[in-house]
């Protein structure tokens, strides 16, 4: 997911400075010399990659699944709303978070910041991309309460010990 986050944030940051046909291209400035794509790019944010079909165990390839979800959210919600959700939901993630955990954290973040106004759009994107279960099925796990996520994250956090100094 980390590569996908990085690609999304770079694409979102530079989107307003690029012509429309290049907005979903990451690294187009570098890829000119070796990419045969038109337009040239290292990776694209508007791919049709889905989970688990396109998961290959390579961080950049797999990151394209995540960045495509985030870019689709940006297209649906607008850059300002999507960027706030993407950045804020990081506080709910742990080093072991998976795609589904992060999608649920986005839903929870929207519930906290926007009273859930965008939950249906968020859920639809992640269901369509194969990351969240289809809500019409028996398993309806999309969206956890903030307290539940915080408690789970606290359980996973390593315990810290503080050495106490002895006073004289």
Locations of regions flagged by a protein language model:
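Zinc-dependent metallohydrolase catalytic domains
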Residues: 1-160
